[in-house]
Each structure stands twice: as structure tokens, then as C-alpha cells.
A protein has these predicted regions:
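N-terminal helical cap/lid subdomain that shapes the substrate entry/recognition surface
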Residues: 17-126
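Asp-based, Mg2+/Mn2+-dependent phosphohydrolase catalytic module
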Residues: 2-21, 31, 45, 54, ...
Length: 247
């Protein structure tokens, strides 16, 4: 278990040469082909439960924000798969609380959970493959740090980018979730790097940019929904400007 890792002490440094790049996954590298609310509504309708996608999207945002972190410190590797599934089952049950837990909820949940495990449920953002290929061509170590679960490994390989990464760190297996500095330190320890030499790129201001900065890395926010800010080089609208940040 990575949760038991011993964190190194890092001395402050003014050397800012980038020697590795870490990425978040969902919202940064990939996106669901349908909104969460739409997928939930489709699978629920198959079980006779009619709820609009917009209602489910709003409930999901609320419940996900209130849920405990998807991390299981001290859990054995053998138990994590079951813990992940139970975590998501509890979350989905909370999402549907206003409409009651329907009779065939267990069947519904299995189908929903398995659907989101398939690469076909996801797509890469247009610039991702070219950007990762360019970074690998520069021989930079790349890793993923995500508050996801074990399904992410299959998804990234199915989307054709799994081999771009030296390691894929998911919070459920590391035992810590972003913005906790310890999940960033797990990746730093794996690569034997100090924080100031690493960019971390993600779509969450709190989990990615602030979390990485708090751990001593250089956090970069990817905000695909707002125009670029020429005064903030560490907020980008897609992954292409990462290449300029390496100069």
C-alpha cells in the first residue's frame, strides 16, 4: 500500500527546470461522452425510474462534493476493489434519495458502474494525444494523479494513452486524495524528484492547482471554459501551452 510511504523532506530550491509533468485525468485528459446526469437518467429509465438529466447532474454535484474522499488509507490491495465499488454505490444511492431507492437498484448500479469502466464511455480532449507524444519525445517522465479509482488504468489504456505514463496514481489505491500533499509526494518519491522540478496540470483550482502548489510543485490549472488570461501563465485553456512552460 502506498499509504504507508515515508515522505521525504524537501529543501527549498530556486532551480525551476521542469523534469516531469503530472496530470489529472477526468476533465484534464478525458471527458465522459455523455454527461453524468444523462448516463444516470438512461440507466435509471431502463429500470423504470424517470428523472431528468439536469436534476441528476445537480444532485451528483451536490452529493459528490459532500462525499468522503475516495481514498482508503491502510486498506489491503485485495480489499480496494470492493471498497471502491461500495463507495460509488453509496454515492449513487444518495444521488437518488429524493426519488427513493428503487426495487432493482442493485442491478442498476452494477450496469452503471461497469459502463463507466469502459473506455467507450470516455473521449480524449483533441490536443491530448499530440501533447503527450511531444512530451514523451522530450523524454520527460509523465504520471497521472487522480481522485479516481482502479478503473482509470483500463480506461486510459483503452483510449490509447496509458503507455504514455510511467505510473498512474489513483487516490483509492494511494490512500490519499488531492489536495492532500501526500498523494503528490507519492508520485515524487516514485520518480525520485523534488517538487520544484515538476508541473502538475489539472482542472480543479482546489485539488490540482492549490493542492500541487501546497506540496511544492508548480500547479497549472486547465480551464477549458474561460478565455486565456495573458497575466496568468499557469492557467491554460487546453494542454498545448504546457510545452511553452517547459522553456
Amino acid at each position: 500500500m502506498l499509504a504507508s510511504l515515508q515522505l521525504r523532506s524537501y529543501a527549498p530550491t530556486c532551480i525551476m527546470t521542469i523534469k516531469a509533468v503530472f496530470f489529472d485525468a477526468a476533465g484534464t485528459l478525458m471527458k465522459p461522452n455523455r454527461s453524468v446526469g444523462e448516463s444516470y437518467a438512461i440507466f435509471a429509465a431502463d429500470c423504470g425510474v424517470k428523472v431528468t438529466p439536469s436534476e441528476l447532474s445537480e444532485r451528483f454535484r451536490l452529493c459528490f462534493g459532500e462525499a468522503p474522499r475516495l481514498a482508503f488509507p491502510g486498506a489491503s490491495d485485495e480489499s480496494i476493489g470492493g471498497l471502491e465499488r461500495e463507495w460509488w454505490k453509496n454515492l449513487v444511492a444518495r444521488v437518488f434519495e429524493p426519488w427513493g431507492r428503487f426495487e432493482n437498484f442493485d442491478k442498476f448500479f452494477v450496469e452503471l458502474f461497469d459502463y463507466f469502466a469502459e473506455p467507450g464511455a470516455w473521449s480524449l480532449y483533441p490536443e491530448v494525444l499530440d501533447t503527450l507524444t511531444e512530451l514523451k519525445g522530450r523524454r520527460l517522465p509523465l504520471s497521472v494523479i487522480s481522485n479516481f479509482d482502479s478503473r482509470l488504468i483500463k480506461i486510459l489504456h483503452g483510449l490509447g494513452v496509458g503507455s504514455c505514463f510511467d505510473q498512474i496514481f489513483v487516490s483509492s489505491r494511494v490512500g490519499y486524495a488531492k489536495p492532500d500533499p501526500q498523494i503528490f509526494h507519492a508520485a515524487l518519491n516514485h520518480h525520485n524528484l523534488i517538487p520544484a522540478h515538476v508541473l502538475h496540470v489539472g482542472d480543479s483550482e482546489i485539488n490540482d492547482r492549490h493542492g500541487a502548489n501546497s506540496a511544492g510543485l508548480r500547479g497549472v490549472l486547465v480551464d477549458r471554459h474561460s478565455p486565456a488570461d495573458p497575466n496568468d501563465r499557469h492557467r491554460i485553456t487546453n494542454l498545448e501551452p504546457i510545452l511553452d512552460l517547459l522553456e
